[in-house]
């Protein structure tokens, strides 16, 4: 996809995704289908930069022909990104220190109005000295001027093994869900939900099914692959306590930031892989859990949002030990494979499709399961 949108055919392609999900998963009980906005839905955008004489353009490469295509407007991106793109390029072209050897431009925007721009170069932006590392003063001055002249909250300069951060390397997103505001730190160059409006729908659906799993808020939730705490925080008021695991050090730190920002006091995040927490629940000891008494938790629900490869064998078995399973999937093929095993012990109560990526084959979905009576 080269930034094109096709609003006139969106309803048709959305219906095709629904049909494909039904073919893969079979019956879709209590099915919710969340359509995206047909334009201006992406909060992230990355473009290569091509220099030809006096001309400098954003480009993307056609997946079939591999030819470069100049991008002059991008209706997929949030309005704030789409509006900024030509203005930013005009300033870059007029500023040699910003333009020279510029290789890529990344945009990260929020519904709450913040904008982070990363300029990536094939030249050095820093110099080693006897006292340390010095930033390219001319580049820093030009970048600061750019930030003053355009609606850019933060600017970052990157080169090979170098990073200049003028102030912050993250934005703060505020998502509105069920008459509540959830605050999330979104760090540059790390995973964030690309379709912020759809992220709100996903949180709404997860909260809805969580309330059915734990109507009196007396039981606890365990979450695997929690990232920056996106779901953990939004589900925290649906459970007595939440234990969330994540393997990325950066994501764990961001989750802690978000826990504090949202004034949540019942979520604990630990840096552990899914297979490690599975072993811990079976009695194996881990140093990272030395301050956590797993036996004190009353888990009745597990939340999983695995990578495209789906659940590994150990985790697939582990999830069946819980009364309720909330499974968010970015790959319906691996979800279908996992459900073949999980459906032996659990029944599907509710399903959902979230169109995170319009005009692509990608499908994001949700499944809520309950243990079958013995």
UniProtKB/Swiss-Prot annotation:
Task: Name the Gene3D superfamilies for this protein.
Answer: 2.40.50.1070, Vaccinia Virus protein VP39
What GO cellular-component annotations does this UniProt entry give?
Answer: cytosol
The kind of enzyme this is, by top-level EC class, is transferase
A GO molecular function held by the record: rRNA binding
Q: Catalysed reaction per UniProt?
A: uridine(54) in tRNA + S-adenosyl-L-methionine = 5-methyluridine(54) in tRNA + S-adenosyl-L-homocysteine + H(+); uridine(341) in tmRNA + S-adenosyl-L-methionine = 5-methyluridine(341) in tmRNA + S-adenosyl-L-homocysteine + H(+)
PROSITE patterns attached to this UniProt entry: SAM_MT_RNA_M5U, TRMA_1, TRMA_2
- The annotated active site, in chain numbering, is 330, 364
Any idea which UniProt keywords this protein has?
Methyltransferase, S-adenosyl-L-methionine, Transferase, tRNA processing
Q: Which family does it belong to?
A: Belongs to the class I-like SAM-binding methyltransferase superfamily. RNA M5U methyltransferase family. TrmA subfamily.
Described purpose of this protein according to its UniProt entry = Dual-specificity methyltransferase that catalyzes the formation of 5-methyluridine at position 54 (m5U54) in all tRNAs, and that of position 341 (m5U341) in tmRNA (transfer-mRNA).
The record, for HAMAP family, names: RNA_methyltr_TrmA
Provide the protein name: tRNA/tmRNA (uracil-C(5))-methyltransferase
Identify the species of origin: Hydrogenovibrio crunogenus (strain DSM 25203 / XCL-2) (Thiomicrospira crunogena)
The UniProt gene name for this protein comes to: trmA
